[in-house]
Amino acid sequence: MASFQIPVINLEVREVKDIVWEKIQEPVNQRRLILVIVSIALLLDNMLYMVIVPIIPDYLREIGSFDDGPTPPPLRDNITGKIIPVHHDHHGQDSATGILFASKAIVQLMVNPFSGGLIDKIGYDLPMMIGLTIMFFSTAVFACGSSYSVLFFARSLQGAGSAFADTAGLAMIADRFTEENERSQALGIALAFISFGCLVAPPFGGALYQFAGKEVPFLILALVCLLDGLMLLLVMKPVKEAMKQSKDVQDQVIPIWRLLMDPYIAVCAGALTMSNVALAFLEPTISLWMEDNMTTDNWKIGMVWLPAFFPHVLGVVITVKMARKYPQHQWLMAAGGLALEGFSCFIIPFCSGYKMLMLPICVICFGIALIDTALLPTLGYLVDVRYVSVYGSIYAIADISYSIAYAVGPIIAGGVVEAIGFTALNFLIAFSNLAYVPVLRKLRNIYDFKPFENEANILMQDPPNKEYQTYVMHDQKPVEGGVKNHLEYGQQYQQEQETNLDDQQYEYQQQQQGYQQGYQQDQGYQPGYQEQGGSYAPQGQPRVANPFQQQQQQQQQQQQQVQSRGPAAPANPFRQGF
């Protein structure tokens, strides 16, 4: 049976498949594809987290999980006729919504220590596939769930999937992008997708929930998760082969508790936790605060987060460019971002308009971008310099830092809002962020251990950069053809001179031989004549001894003695000097 031939390119499907598979297996394309897969996985995970912000409070009230009780009639001022707003008693809805939000982070916090160690042992591809599979099922359960208990189970299941997918994704980027600037840029792109998921998901979920129902946004995200898993199948085999080649490094795994005891890593982890405290406390509470003070439209409540995407991406770009020029000042960028978050939390409770509220939220997201983009590459750098370049446990610590904020934040936020109000909650967030800023000063000296500027970590299977030309160490000739080892070069050049000193000595001998010939012509015997029988006959004179000729004769005798002993050893092209 003849295979189908594609009309335009005149190639069979099998040939096209082989060409595409060969291109995918190239190291450069592998890294690009891995970055795309990890970015989609992080986008999906954060969209699943944030898409429920405008949906869950209204949906739980709709299915009757909470009862607001009898609504009192609106009060009117007898003089002006102005309607006085009535305080809504949510009957524990703040706390219950916060627990539902925090269930994902609590499970993720418990699974992360095990997922990080497992990733260090077996590689990155299989744990990431496990995470995507769990996230797919949790999203499907979210779409079909119609009670608080089912939604709680789906939310917790998503936390287990995130513990594998997020940690494996960040570790995979750090492992494949070993050069510091490339790693910062790749992690910056991944953080841009994280921000896109966090900030676009609320308007995405709110609009689809209001106009199409609760099931539609979750079914779309489940489809994206399935497609990302299929893309991961394309890189699983090559990545697994690479892990087998570096098995000797995998055996030197550093325990996660030992990394946590490192003071520099602990400071970075604390900063990542504090950077996410603001969003973790505000996300489950600001929607109810907006319903009481601004608007009850679900799409508007979700849309308040959308403009913050642009300053977040701007913060990522600025931090990547600044880190490339001033890597020793990344701690200062993180400190500035944390201070911006604290000042913005002071402003939020005093915002009286919908558009005014967008401004401090944008500044908060800009500060988060500064912190995350500066500290995530710093964690990989600390492991490279102080430990072994295995990244599962270190990025499990980063994921634990996020999980602590999102596990504790929603639960405490709901209780604080019910006890002392939304304004006091924002003040507590602001003071905690500003208090942690001086702690980041401990990171100011970590780049004293920075390698030489021209020294770079490369992957052995990557092709050489076209900016460089490889030369043989011996005679400075470009390497022709394929790559050879030192034994092959030794066989190729064994007939040539062994060292640069031999070349100089050989030139010296040639020069002295020419000098000797000139000496004989100039200083040699000019024939004298004696009259013998009416004719002149030449009469010889004794030749003056030439020290250079004697030296040459001695050297020739020594060479003959060496040749009589046997063949010389092969020349070593890497030996220099004597």
Curated annotation (Swiss-Prot):
Gene Ontology MF term list: acetylcholine transmembrane transporter activity; xenobiotic transmembrane transporter activity
Principal subcellular localisation of the protein: membrane
Glycosylation sites (chain numbering): 78, 293
Cytoplasmic side: 1-32, 120-125, 176-187, 237-263, 321-330, 377-387, 435-578
GO BP terms, alphabetized: chemical synaptic transmission
Subcellular location as annotated: Membrane
Residue ranges, annotated region (Disordered): 507-578
Membrane topology per record: Multi-pass membrane protein
GO cellular component annotations of the record: AP-1 adaptor complex; AP-2 adaptor complex; terminal bouton
PROSITE patterns referenced in this protein's UniProt entry, alphabetically: MFS (PS50850)
Lumenal, vesicle compartment spans: 54-98, 147-154, 209-215, 285-299, 352-355, 409-413
Keywords assigned by UniProt, alphabetized: Glycoprotein, Membrane, Neurotransmitter transport, Transmembrane, Transmembrane helix, Transport
Highest taxon above the source species: Eukaryota
TM region positions: 33-53, 99-119, 126-146, 155-175, 188-208, 216-236, 264-284, 300-320, 331-351, 356-376, 388-408, 414-434
Biased composition (Low complexity): 507-534, 549-563
Family of this protein: Belongs to the major facilitator superfamily. Vesicular transporter family.
Function: Involved in acetylcholine transport into synaptic vesicles.
Protein name: Vesicular acetylcholine transporter
Species, as recorded: Drosophila melanogaster
